[in-house]
Amino acid sequence: MDSAEYERKIAHRFAAFDQDGNDYIDRADFNAAAARLLTEFGTKARCDKGQALYTGAEAFWQGMAGIADVDGDQRVTREEFVGGAVKRLRDNPGRFAEIARPFLRAAIAVAGSTETDGSTVATVAAVERALRVLGAEEDVASTAAGSLDTDGDGTIAEADVVAAVAAYFTVIEPDA
Ligand code: CA
Ligand code: CA
């Protein structure tokens, strides 16, 4: 992979976190993501699902800051993202899954439903909507949501989303 391709892939991942587009990742981006999801799915912030989503967003931010905010200014710059989030997590993808899981679980609950075992599941269409409201382009959201439905039953389980998100942010590979 040439450096231009690598830079482009990193830029996409950075932009996915930088929800307000001000060129750094901070707590406000995670809160913005939570707010967008709640609005899209008509869920109030002041309910169990809404609170779980904000709690998950805060945990995700704290985890991201712990890994990538090298200078401790409560902002993750592009340089910090590349050096910390991408390089360090590449060696430990399980760590990313761990910090992202509470947010993803809560997001899927907002978009879908909670199973009796506490895990969450959503339809392919709902996951596509969630990805679009978080800034993914239409075709990207559609392709990504479709590929998450590995058994083709029209629904996507929490574990599949966590694994896919962890892989997306920790494994930067050339296009096939
Ligand atoms: Ca931002
Ligand atoms: Ca920083």
Question: What is the predicted role of each segment?
Answer:
Residues 1-5, 55-56, 98-99, 134-136:
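Short helix-capping and inter-helix turn/linker motifs at the boundaries of alpha-helical repeat units
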Residues 1-50:
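The feature marks the first
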Residues 7-22, 51-73, 101-119, 140-158:
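Primarily EF-hand calcium-binding motifs
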Residues 25-45, 76-91, 121-135, 157-171:
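Amphipathic regulatory helices of Ca2+-sensor modules
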Residues 81, 85, 97-104:
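Well-ordered, non-transmembrane segments within structured domains
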Residues 90-98:
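Solvent-exposed, charged amphipathic helical/linker segments at domain boundaries
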